[in-house]
Amino acid sequence: MKLRFLTIIAALMVLAPLEVDAQRGHIRPSHPHIGDRYTFFRGIGVTFGYVNSQYYTQDKATDDRISSDLMNGFTIGLTKDFALLPHALYFQTGLNYIYQNDSRNENIKIPLTDMSVRIVGDREEHHLGIPLRLKYDVHILDNIGLTFDAGPTLLMGLSSKYLYKTRLSEGMVTSVDYNLYNGKVKSNGNQSGDFNLEQWMDDKGMYPKGRLGRFDVMLGASVGAHFFHILEVRLGYDYGLLNRYRNDVADMYSMHRGQFTLSAGKRF
């Protein structure tokens, strides 16, 4: 139901400016440089960039706040601008794919033994985002302009997992796959011998206090520059408005996501 609701909102916000733009008849300005800017913002944008994000968990009773390890990754997507005020104000939407990862690689000494094990693990996340932004353009020089945008991005999580494995001895490999959305754990190998990988992950606080929701509404802003009516670079920050915890845990704790993005794009 929630997915249908978000899809309807996105569709309405995309179609509304499209209809307004169509009614204007695509009138091109007479000034040559302004005309180039008009063409630039009417094109389809292909963007690729670096993403750095972090989760913030807060205890509602004590206000204690814990920040997760930083996650790095990339984003790739398509954008489209629709003119609201000619050559100045635009509505931007599109579809972005976001991948991020936090790797861990360390040696652990097994208590009461002379043995040590090497643990290799990742936290991986995949998201889809639909930006719904207002974008303002400032003309600086003939071939250079600045843009400022702000607004929400509808975010849907495709996957969020911990993937850890270790080798206790030759031929004895254990692994744990934990799904943060449904709370399911898949274990392979011996988890009850000298070293229990699943218990180690629990002791390290890797399992969240409850399952996480897939959906978020990220509110943010960015500043950018475009060059020669073709290339565009942007730097922005977004913060999640929804508590990612679900069910009863959401009454005691809140988890929100912050994200920096540095991207470059080209319009066609």
For each of these PLM feature ranges, what is it?
Residues 22-75, 145, 172, 176-177, ...:
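Short glycine/proline- and aromatic-enriched beta-strand/turn motifs that initiate or cap beta-hairpins
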Residues 31-32, 60-67, 114-121, 206-209, ...:
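Extracellular loop and loop/strand-boundary signature of outer-membrane beta-barrel proteins
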Residues 38, 68-73, 122-127, 209-216, ...:
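Short sequence motifs at beta-strands and strand-loop junctions characteristic
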Residues 41-57, 63-118:
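Glycine- and aromatic-enriched membrane insertion/assembly motifs of diderm outer-membrane
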Residues 52-60, 99-107, 122, 140, ...:
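Gram-negative outer-membrane beta-barrel proteins
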Residues 73-79, 90, 129-133, 220, ...:
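Membrane-embedded beta-strand positions in outer-membrane beta-barrel channels/transporters
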Residues 84, 88, 130, 134-231, ...:
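Outer-membrane beta-barrel transmembrane domain signature
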Residues 256-268:
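Outer-membrane beta-barrel "beta-signal"
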